[in-house]
């Protein structure tokens, strides 16, 4: 379960921001999670509760926004929706389509005190 290490990285990023911005508590963390990534939202939520225990983020709410897959088809010069990695273009059928969205995990927003 690599979700633990992903959440540990998020908590480390939050701790780094605390040192820069001098806040005392995190109330909410919003993640942008790619639908084509290999992290499961429910597993991230489960790990979040365990990993944040005893940290500045303990008790914070975790919101997860799912980013749908998109790619650029160089054959038909269009941005197209992707439902899986390494898929052919749903418009022209050519492959490969260069993925442009849907594989990310980013901290999009934090509410702090």
Curated annotation (Swiss-Prot):
A molecular function (GO) term: nickel cation binding
Keywords, alphabetical: Metal-binding, Nickel, Zinc
Keyword Zinc appears in the UniProt entry: yes
Membrane-spanning segments: none
GO BP of this protein: protein maturation; protein modification process
Pfam families: HypA
Binding-site residues for Ni(2+), renumbered to this chain: 2
InterPro entries xrefs: HypA/HybF (IPR000688)
Sequence positions that bind Zn(2+): 73, 76, 89, 92
Signal peptide feature range: none
Keyword Acyltransferase: no
Family: Belongs to the HypA/HybF family.
PANTHER family linked to this entry: HYDROGENASE MATURATION FACTOR HYPA (PTHR34535:SF3)
Function (record text): Involved in the maturation of [NiFe] hydrogenases. Required for nickel insertion into the metal center of the hydrogenase.
HAMAP family referenced in this protein's UniProt entry, alphabetically: HypA_HybF
Protein name per its UniProtKB record: Hydrogenase maturation factor HypA
Native source organism of the sequence: Methylocella silvestris (strain DSM 15510 / CIP 108128 / LMG 27833 / NCIMB 13906 / BL2)
Record lineage: Bacteria, Pseudomonadati, Pseudomonadota, Alphaproteobacteria, Hyphomicrobiales
């Amino acid at each position: 379960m690599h979700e633990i290490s992903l959440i540990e990285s998020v908590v480390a990023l939050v701790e780094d921001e605390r040192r820069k911005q001098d806040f005392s508590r995190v109330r909410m963390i919003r993640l942008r999670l790619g639908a084509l990534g290999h992290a499961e939202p429910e597993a991230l939520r489960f790990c979040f509760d365990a990993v944040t225990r005893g940290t500045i983020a303990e008790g914070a709410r975790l919101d997860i926004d799912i980013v749908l897959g998109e790619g650029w088809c160089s054959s038909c010069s269009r941005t197209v929706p992707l439902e899986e990695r390494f898929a052919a273009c749903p418009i022209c059928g050519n492959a490969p389509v260069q993925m442009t969205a849907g594989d990310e995990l980013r901290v999009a927003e934090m509410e702090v005190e």
